[in-house]
Amino acid sequence: MPGKFQTGLRVLATCLFALLVLGGILVAYVTGYQFIHTDRHHLSFGLYGAILGLHLLSQSLFAFLEHRKMRGGGRCPSGKSTVVLCIAAYQEDPEYLRKCLRSVRRLSYPHLRVIMVVDGNTEEDRYMMDIFREVMGSEGTCCYIWDKNYHESEEGGQEGERGVQEMVKNFQYVCIMQKWGGKREVTYTAFRALGDSVAYVQVCDSDTVLDPACTAEMLRILEEDPEVGGVGGDVQILNKYESWISFLSSFRYWMAFNVERACQSYFGCVQCISGPLGMYRNSLLQYFLEDWYHQTFLGQKCSFGDDRHLTNRVLSMGFRTKYTARSRCLTETPTRYLRWLNQQTRWSKSYFREWLYNALWFHKHHLWMTYESVVTGFFPFFLVATVVQLFYRGRVWNILLFLLTVQLVGILKATYACILRGNAEMIFMSLYSLLYMTSLLPAKIFAVITIKKSGWGTSGRRKLVVNFMGMVPVSVWFCILLGGLVYTAYCQSHDPFTETELLFLLTGAILYGCYWVALLSLYLALIARRCGKRQELYNLALEEVSEPEPAAKAIKP
């Protein structure tokens, strides 16, 4: 009874805290209270801006403190714990898959077992199994073609299940091709086949290049603290210079992991252990495996957001989740705008869906988890309201001031990233703010509206499928902004600029123009010439493994 009473108090206190945070932001936004301002409010600094500034400052500070703890290192893992690496593969680009498997062969952890499950068992998918046999060699390797999967086995189909489990138990390297079912299905197969035969499970995508020490670094954190249930590593971009969209995405990735997740890790509440590089206690996975697989939302089975829901399941049990920049990998990101937009929409859907689930467990973790979830969850809606309000006030200066503010915040964050990373190239991160405002922001709102729609979201990399649905919210957003510009032009034509306003406009326009001229000139001079080529300009060594041994034989039931 005392335990239930304490839990009830924590739930009540957490709910009140969340309402206090949201209410405070809402009051600051609605009242528009300003600390300082010019005579005609051309420039001002208010309570709402102070709250957002304090949030960014706090987040950066805690991220810095967590990085300082990471640099301290710790004891090396014993090497006695059993670890299995599970790779999910779906229509993968052969070049990326080879790089992934070669990096797996270079992992420094002894006796690491590997399971790759291919989502598809047709002849078109066979090349992935062939690459697995080619790279992994024949010693301790077995491949299996399954006509079904765990959830489509008919009566008497236990033979296929037993075959999978026997191979996983007896071979070090296993590749399974199974009937198509989505990423969650192939991940389930790997986890289910393992059972309780291992202590830790590492996850990886088939487009990921792993650093040799990544397994040992994540395992070290799990062995040091029994209260940590999962840990993620630093995921950066493999094809950074392949296009402008992948180049800008590389900065977003760095900020997401080395600032946002590092800050969450300081409080032990990382809210998403990314699929390309993560590790979990297998005992936890086996405990909630069925609930994770059968997850539903508004009566529909969930088919995306697997990684975030895995993390949420760990958090729901009261275990902490951590991030370490000492464990690194490189992964592919979309190089085309439409594919990137669809990916971001899918991720946004899973974010908002999992936000609701995550809220059930706020009371089990540090208050920072509650605070950050409220701020980041509601921020896009406040931002949309701000943009619409400024574009429809009928003054050109309001629009220009908003654009200047967006870029100023971007420059400040980019400067911090330059200092923290020690790389001047991070200054280009400020360009991402425009991509966020024009594309990612409407995609987030669209994700909320269409949150029940499911699917892979992003096509396989071998055969790219163009999906124009992502352009719908962007087109609507541009129409809204265009309407604001037309309305502003109409209002200003009937209300000429004052001398002071004209001075502000000219100064602001010159500053904004100089910013873009400087950044675009640097981009064209230093970066553009490198884009469009698959250059191996990686931070991680990619030595070739030794010549593969004769291929292992594939088994078909």
Curated annotation (Swiss-Prot):
Record localization: Cell membrane; Golgi apparatus membrane; Golgi apparatus, trans-Golgi network membrane; Cytoplasmic vesicle
Segments on the Cytoplasmic side according to the record's topology features: 1-10, 66-367, 420-430, 485-501
Key words, A-Z: Cell membrane, Cytoplasmic vesicle, Glycosyltransferase, Golgi apparatus, Membrane, Transferase, Transmembrane, Transmembrane helix
Membrane association type: Multi-pass membrane protein
Role, per record: Catalyzes the addition of GlcNAc or GlcUA monosaccharides to the nascent hyaluronan polymer. Therefore, it is essential to hyaluronan synthesis a major component of most extracellular matrices that has a structural role in tissues architectures and regulates cell adhesion, migration and differentiation. This is one of three isoenzymes responsible for cellular hyaluronan synthesis.
Keyword Glycosyltransferase: yes
Molecular function, one GO term: hyaluronan synthase activity
Cofactor(s) needed: Mg(2+)
Known catalytic reactions: [hyaluronan](n) + UDP-N-acetyl-alpha-D-glucosamine = N-acetyl-beta-D-glucosaminyl-(1->4)-[hyaluronan](n) + UDP + H(+); N-acetyl-beta-D-glucosaminyl-(1->4)-[hyaluronan](n) + UDP-alpha-D-glucuronate = [hyaluronan](n+1) + UDP + H(+)
Pathway this chain belongs to: Glycan biosynthesis; hyaluronan biosynthesis
UniProt topological domain (Extracellular) ranges: 32-44, 389-398, 452-463, 523-557
Protein family membership: Belongs to the NodC/HAS family.
GO BP term, example: hyaluronan biosynthetic process
Modification comment: O-GlcNAcylation increases the hyaluronan synthase activity, HAS3 stability and its plasma membrane residence. The concentration of UDP-GlcNAc controls the level of O-GlcNAc modification.
Chain ranges passing through the membrane: 11-31, 45-65, 368-388, 399-419, 431-451, 464-484, 502-522
Protein name per the record: Hyaluronan synthase 3
GO cellular component, one term: Golgi membrane
Cross-referenced PANTHER family: HYALURONAN SYNTHASE (PTHR22913), HYALURONAN SYNTHASE 3 (PTHR22913:SF6)
Pfam family, one: Glyco_tranf_2_3
Class of the enzyme per the UniProt entry, highest EC level: transferase
Record-listed E.C. numbers: 2.4.1.212
Gene: has3
Database matches in InterPro entries: Nucleotide-diphossugar_trans
